[in-house]
């Protein structure tokens, strides 16, 4: 685990159940955003930026997202893949009809099925890799039991993300100005205790 304590929206404390509804989309940092990544929505907006800078490496960010799912689990996950998003999502993607609706109590297995539908290898999706590190998801999609076949919904020419590398720096080889900017952004976005 990389994170043990989370700031989250307070109304969850009074909820009888949490139902996580998401769209199946490509994502620049995570390869795909689906059930696991969508739970990041429970983090307040101002804190999201702080977490993005604190966990700027894609695998660290994915591990934090898995920590969040374990700390504040939803009881049901629903993926709207009637129309998904392909290309450079989530901001520069394009709508793509897929034609299915998926649901599960297990977000990690659900994400693996969704990755299979869009032809994205699980190894390219940090949240799936992070879940597999903790044995929350099987290594092979064939180990997942489903009520109806998902294979008819495979989109063979789905356009996946072109670049899922770390957006702040690439393997530590960023230009000097990029490293300096990264340090400034980290300092500005990180919370520090203070005396009032």
Regions inferred by a protein language model and the residue ranges of each:
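Extended, low-polarity segments enriched in aliphatic/aromatic residues
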Residues: 1-196
């Amino acid at each position: 685990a990389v994170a043990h304590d989370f700031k989250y929206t307070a109304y969850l404390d009074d909820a009888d159940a949490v139902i996580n509804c998401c769209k199946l989309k490509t994502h620049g940092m995570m390869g795909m955003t689906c059930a696991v990544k969508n739970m990041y929505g429970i983090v307040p907006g101002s804190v999201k930026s702080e977490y993005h800078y604190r966990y700027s490496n894609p695998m660290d960010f994915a591990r934090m997202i898995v920590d969040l799912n374990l700390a504040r689990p939803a009881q049901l996950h629903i993926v709207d893949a009637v129309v998904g998003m392909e290309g450079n999502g989530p901001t520069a993607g394009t709508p793509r009809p897929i034609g299915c609706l998926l649901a599960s109590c297990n977000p990690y297995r659900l994400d693996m099925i969704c990755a299979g539908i869009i032809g994205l290898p699980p190894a390219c999706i940090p949240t799936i890799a992070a879940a597999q590190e903790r044995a929350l998801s099987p290594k092979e999609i064939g180990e997942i039991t489903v009520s109806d076949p998902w294979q008819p919904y495979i989109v063979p020419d789905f356009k996946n993300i072109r670049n899922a590398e770390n957006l702040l720096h690439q393997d530590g080889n960023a230009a000097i100005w990029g490293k300096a900017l990264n340090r400034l952004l980290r300092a500005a976005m990180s919370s520090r205790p203070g005396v009032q």
